[in-house]
Amino acid sequence: MTNNLTLICDSVEYNGYPHANIKINDSIVYSGIVDDCKNKFDIPIPSGAGMHTLSIQRYGKTEKNISSDCEQILKVNGILIDGVAVPKHILVDNSKFEFNHIVNHGSLDFYPNGTWIFCFQTPFITWCMDQKISHDAKFNNNYLLPWSYQLGPNQADQLIYDIDQLFEKLEVIHD
């Protein structure tokens, strides 16, 4: 069984469209021009638990593709895994663009030649929820329990209190 990843790109043409090698787990799934006609890529990914890497190696940009007012650009507009959009904050938190020994974390626009890398894990929904918990924990100390991602501030404490009250009632009934 395989899962499906859909990569949606955009490009800005200037004396030609950007060229790219698109890889999943170091296997090339597309090599060529990314333009208005070819900007959506359906990529099968192996199912089962494991880490995966989507990479886009941009190449072929020269001085002819740059001017003072315009430049050739390649952009990642979105990624869907099994039809579910990867939230932008997860894309930004788990991606980087490397060029000329420089690493830019969270960049979704590629101006120079270089390699963009997005690391993710399957099963995707579990990994996505873990990423949401980690992201929310940066801004809210109340997200301490793994299942509390769907609870708002202080709701985990209230839920624990309600459960304790139910146990007390059960003890009274049992005695």
Annotate each PLM feature.
Residues 11-76, 87-117:
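Beta-strand-rich ligand-recognition modules
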Residues 6-10:
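Short edge beta-strand/loop segments characteristic of extracellular beta-sandwich folds
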Residues 1-3, 13-15, 86-175:
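Activation corresponds to long, low-complexity, non-globular regions
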Residues 1-5, 49-51:
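Extended extracellular/luminal ectodomain segments enriched in beta-structured repeat modules
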